[in-house]
Amino acid sequence: HDSKRNGKKYLFDLPVRAESYFSSKEIRDVRWPEDVLVTSIRRGQQNVVATGKTVMQTGDVLHVLTDLGLAKTVQEELKQLEKRQIFDT
């Protein structure tokens, strides 16, 4: 990963679907890929500052920050993680 860190950042949206692994979990309870930061959450019409104790809810849109060079890899890792079932921890 070191060669893909160039100081430039990439911010993208990650929706939380009903069947998502992220739904009903606190941010700190997820094993996020390296170099990922959930900065805030759009919840309805509000933007919520994300902390480790923030519980992600169905319908939320996570604002995720990572290094630009890692963006594709991180997005793929998050897609795989999102598909995990709640009992598969």
Where does each model-flagged region fall?
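Cytosolic Rossmann-like ligand/nucleotide-binding regulatory domains
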Residues: 13-77
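Membrane-interfacial segments at transmembrane helix termini in multi-pass membrane proteins
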Residues: 1-10, 75, 80-88
